Amino acid sequence: VNPHPNADKLRVCTVDIGGRDKEIVCGGSNLYRGEKVVVALPGAMVKWHGEGDLVEIKESKLRGVDSYGMICASSEIGLGDLLPADGDHVIADLANFDCKAGQPIAEVLDLDDIILEIDNKSMTNRPDLWGHYGIAREISALYNLPLVEIPEFPKTEQGDLDVRIGDEERCRRYLGVEIDGLYVKEAPYKMQNRIWKVGMRPINALVDVTNYVMLAVGQPTHAFDSDNISDYITARRAKDGEKLVLLNNEEIELCSDDLVIADSQGPVGLA
């Protein structure tokens, strides 16, 4: 990684693409010697800075220096949600992946997969099929195939979590589990990858686990920080004009038709 002779914000990189080197000019802010990066060679299609239409990479001269490809940010190859960047002009750093120079990125990230889309409009009467495990169980029964059972955790002592139902007509059952000793960190990549493949965005281990459970067994779940829950948690109708801040920090105004999860201070989530 060398300075560009004519541009302070650019670097001239010699990149091993598998048995041969390519000189590529790059403006990534996180470049370092020995970094594992994603390279688009001439002919590849990318989204410049992750925006607009796809453009074809060509050999070019950038501020007087020849460049034979592009070192990519994750958003430029459609992987911004799977490999989120920490800031602007940050390229995808594959330091945490076991890969070698020249290996296809789809292979490195386990993207070369087959995804089956199952339209469940015709089986709304079968909520047991709304998750991956339900479909697997059905296929197992139809074709007499072995089914891997989901292990059960042993029951523990009853805690002091106060869970209530404030609208039994619209919510017949609402359960809570309190888990101690957790902290926020990234989920394992395998979990993030599976969540991303079905169109969801990985967030962190706690959020991803709840979404993973929903996708696996069809049961929606949500994690709350017990330090932020006052007195109890309940499923009830919202009051007209109540406000709720969503996970994306967007504030919405609720009406009495909305079903919410709330504590003694007000709504903490949409049901």
Give the label of every model feature segment.
Residues 2-5, 11-13, 143, 147-243, ...:
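Glycine/proline-enriched, intrinsically flexible loops and inter-domain linkers
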Residues 26, 248-249:
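A structural connector/turn signal
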Residues 256-270:
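Catalytic nucleotidyl-transfer cores of nucleotide-processing enzymes
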Residues 34, 203, 257-259:
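Loop/turn positions that initiate beta-strands
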Residues 17-20, 239, 263-266:
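Short acidic-glycine loop/turn motifs at beta-strand connectors
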Residues 39-41, 254, 262:
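A generic structural signal for residues embedded in beta-strands
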Residues 29, 252-253:
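Residue "hotspots" at secondary-structure boundaries inside conserved domains
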Residues 1-153:
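Phosphate-backbone binding interfaces of nucleic-acid-interacting proteins
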